[in-house]
Structures are given as structure tokens and as C-alpha cells.
């Protein structure tokens, strides 16, 4: 965990020194993008591995170079984009809504596109926990970022449904911030205080392969159906000053998603290679083919999160619709 943090900090420092601030020129020639761990970021992995962004930019007359950085959660990514050390961020709906609310009157950060619709599972190694009501002070639930990650907010929505109005934060004291790989390792060791892990693919499926683990919560059940897990966001300044870069990015993202749908086996192999994963390409392909996992630009149930966060005081003002949260690039899509 500590080594990955040092790498991320070092990478950011290097980018901050080496690269000019976003929007320094009308069309940025070097674009800095960030992603996180997990197969939910598969389209970005395909874009990076096959240099699709550069290829589509070239069609528009741009000689584009890309710099990719990996984060463990959306919170530090937001710090990077606010400080001008990042052009495209990607993460959960929660961090997007948080930075949208905080920057409305200055940087104007908005979503460029949704990245996928995928469920999140809260798994546990504690046989006594059947529902979230069964967690006690002896349990600890790992998730990417306490209170602000999409997992944390989904847990709050579930807690309010389970314990009643005003009780959305009842389980917050039991949560701990850990990146997905570290959360998995901590719970599966059986020697950690971590007995629960609210995570994403492939980690949640890996955990359930172990007979000691069972699922306590499925985010699709909490929200009443498929919902957006990850989104991509940028500042209004970058969006306005780099129209061709945005056009190339959307084209590359669409290209990557089509390649995933057309050839899941090839996409799986590319992800395993890029992540230097110990998981087999066949295992990842199986996850890609699950009907519950979809890579799409269409935002789904983003307003469910927005309305909840607004009601409990985490988001102000409340967006009137999902399109308020995203740039016009995807307004024609049937979002929610």
C-alpha cells in the first residue's frame, strides 16, 4: 500500500514539474489522464494500450501525447485536477458530484462521459453478518474513501433504508479507507480488523470465489437497478479551450467500448497485460461477459446519488437534472 502511494505521489510530482497547466494553449498537445484499479476502467486501458486517443486526435490534425497516472480513489484525483496537474479524471459518481458542487462558481468541473454501469458488492468474511444491520463495533468495512467514495455513499443510502431517516451515517464509524487491492488483501488475510469490503470488479468476484466470503449488499439492489459506477470529468476551462481534444477523446472512448463488445477475449488479455495481473485472461473475459457489467457512455441513476447527497447536505446546490452535471457532448444520450 505504502509503495503504491509513493509511486502515485512521485508520478504526480513529476507531472507537475514537467507539464504545463491545462489549457495553456488553445489545443493541448500533451494530455494528462488518470484512472484507478479494476476492470471498470477497461475502456481507458484499451485507449492507453492501443493509443486510440492519439490515433483519433491525429485524424483531427492534432499531434497528441498522453500521460497516464493511477490513483487509489477519486479524492486525491480531484485535488490534482483542481491544482491543474490533471486534464481528465475518472472515478466514482460520488467524487464527481463532490467536485461539481465545490467548483460550480470557479473551475466548473463537469462530467465528460459515463464510463460504465456496474454493480458494487459489499462482501464479508464474518459468518455472523447476513445484512448490514449485523455489523458491530468489532467489524471494519474497507472501501476506497470514507464518506465520499461511491461505495461510501451507497452504504449510506443502504443504511438509511435499513435503520431509518437520519441514520444514513450509522455505519460510517466502521469504514476504513483502503484501495481495492489492499482492501481485498486485508480482508482475505483473516488477520486484519477488516471483516467487510465494499468493492468493485474484479476484486468482489475474486473474494466470492473463496468459500469463507459471502455477499451482504449489491448496489443494483440498493439503487433499484443498473447504475453508473465510473465517470470521466474535466474542468470547463479545459473543455472550452480544447474542443478537438474533447472530440478525439469521445471518439477514442467509443472506439474502445466497441472493441470490448466485439472482442471480450482480446480486451481481457490487454487488461491482464497492462495491470500485470495474476488473474487469467479467461477469468477476466468471463467477468466482461457478465450481463450486469456494461461499458457505456450513458449516465444511469446519477440523479439518485445527487438527490441523496443534496438531501443530507453533501451537495449544494442540487442539480436540476443529470445534464447539469455533464458537458453538452453527451446531452443527447438517454441519461438519468
Language model: regions and residue ranges:
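Bacterial N-terminal signal peptides
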Residues: 10-20
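Solvent-exposed, polar/charged alpha-helical surfaces in well-ordered, non-transmembrane soluble domains
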Residues: 55, 75, 79, 83, ...
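Conserved C-terminal helix/tail region of periplasmic/extracytoplasmic solute-binding proteins
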Residues: 309-336
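Signal peptide processing junction and immediate N-terminal pro/mature segment
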Residues: 21-26
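Bacterial N-terminal signal peptides that target proteins for export
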Residues: 1-11
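Pocket-lining segment of extracytoplasmic ligand-binding domains
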Residues: 181-272
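Secondary-structure end/capping motifs
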Residues: 239-316
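Short, glycine-/small- and polar/acidic-enriched structural segments
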Residues: 27-168, 172-177, 191, 195-201, ...
